[in-house]
């Protein structure tokens, strides 16, 4: 099996993230998606001797990669998804004391590039797709038993694939005779099922995305993680979230907007502005930030990234 450190990962919107977090030398920060530690390394560079960085990741290979920071007493990592952030930070006695939370969503380059992880339709490997390979159901196991209607819904809803019904039907027809266990096998089934090809995207792009999001409960994790971030952040603490597709970005944008609203009251009710504002949790900072043309030229995978930043009130 190919080792994870053979795959290079370039952190996206790196300088923009560090600026967004407005790092205090002695602050306490969370890298909610450690990956291969690119953002963590730069946060540590910005921290002073008394600063602290707590990282989260559910990928065992990411936990292994974090060993490079083992000698830095300011750093610690928790092998859990960021959906567990509220409970883990409460256990450390740090709820309401975190100065910044960074979330870099989606799949990392090492996960995509390692065929054995089963995320890529361009590299043949076991059809796995789990962020944490030590638990949960693989994509192959789910596709072997899922109802056609459920497969359709997942591919349409999470993959935003208009040919979801055709693809699901092809999957169910194929598995009657042959187990679907390889990424190349699934990609071929999808390719043959999609009647109209997008010249800018591989036919399997959206379906693979949808299945991956479902297998890892990514959107539910994001909802829980965003709420957890507001719970652990100190007043004026920063939340910075990088998303890579419209489902994630819409969810993040809506969350920040909803948390920035005050109390909703009838128009003629005698209530002060202070009482209305009391329910506000976050304040959006600036507009969505996208990578520069230079960054996209250096790292094509950054092209769809969007950074949104908010501050705890």
Curated annotation (Swiss-Prot):
It catalyses: cytidine(1402) in 16S rRNA + S-adenosyl-L-methionine = N(4)-methylcytidine(1402) in 16S rRNA + S-adenosyl-L-homocysteine + H(+). Signal peptide: none annotated. InterPro entries: RsmH, SAM-dep_MeTrfase_MraW_recog, SAM-dependent_MTases_sf. It is an enzyme of class 2 (transferase). SUPFAM superfamilies: Putative methyltransferase TM0872, insert domain, S-adenosyl-L-methionine-dependent methyltransferases. GO terms for cellular component: cytoplasm. GO terms for biological process: rRNA base methylation. Pfam families: Methyltransf_5. The keyword Transferase applies. GO terms for molecular function: rRNA (cytosine-N4-)-methyltransferase activity. Its EC number is 2.1.1.199. It comes from the Bacteria. Coiled coil: none annotated. The keyword Transmembrane helix does not apply. Keywords: Cytoplasm, Methyltransferase, rRNA processing, S-adenosyl-L-methionine, Transferase. Its main location: cytoplasm. S-adenosyl-L-methionine binds at residues 37-39, 57, 82, 104, 111. Specifically methylates the N4 position of cytidine in position 1402 (C1402) of 16S rRNA. Belongs to the methyltransferase superfamily. RsmH family. This is Ribosomal RNA small subunit methyltransferase H. It comes from Alteromonas mediterranea (strain DSM 17117 / CIP 110805 / LMG 28347 / Deep ecotype). The lineage of its organism: Bacteria, Pseudomonadati, Pseudomonadota, Gammaproteobacteria, Alteromonadales. The gene is rsmH.
């Amino acid at each position: 099996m190919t080792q994870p450190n053979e795959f290079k990962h370039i952190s996206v919107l790196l300088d923009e993230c560090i600026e967004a977090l407005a790092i205090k030398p002695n602050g306490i920060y969370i890298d909610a998606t450690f990956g291969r530690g690119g953002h963590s390394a730069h946060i540590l560079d910005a921290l002073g001797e008394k600063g602290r960085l707590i990282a989260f990741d559910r990928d065992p290979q990411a936990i292994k990669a974090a060993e490079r920071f083992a000698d830095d007493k300011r750093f610690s990592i928790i092998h859990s998804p960021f959906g567990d952030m509220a409970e883990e930070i409460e256990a450390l006695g740090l709820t309401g004391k975190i100065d910044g939370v960074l979330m870099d969503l989606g799949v990392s380059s090492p996960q995509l590039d390692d065929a054995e992880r089963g995320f890529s339709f361009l590299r043949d490997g076991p059809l796995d797709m789990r962020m944490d390979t030590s638990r949960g159901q693989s994509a192959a196991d789910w596709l072997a038993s899922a109802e056609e209607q459920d497969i359709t819904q997942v591919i349409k809803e999470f993959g935003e694939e208009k040919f979801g019904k055709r693809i699901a039907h092809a999957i169910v027809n194929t598995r009657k005779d042959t187990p679907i266990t390889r990424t190349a096998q699934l990609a071929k089934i999808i390719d043959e099922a999609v009647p109209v090809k997008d010249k800018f995207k591989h036919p399997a792009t959206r379906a693979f995305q949808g299945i991956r999001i479902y297998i890892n409960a990514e959107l539910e994790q994001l909802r829980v993680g965003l709420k957890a971030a507001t719970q652990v952040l100190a007043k004026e603490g920063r939340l910075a979230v990088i998303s890579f597709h419209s489902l994630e970005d819409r969810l993040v944008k809506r969350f920040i907007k909803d948390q920035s609203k005050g109390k909703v009251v009838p128009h003629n009710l005698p209530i002060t502005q202070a009482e209305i504002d009391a329910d506000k949790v976050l304040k959006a900072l600036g507009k969505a930030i996208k990578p520069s043309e230079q960054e996209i030229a250096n790292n094509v995978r950054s092209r769809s990234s969007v950074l949104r930043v908010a501050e705890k009130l």
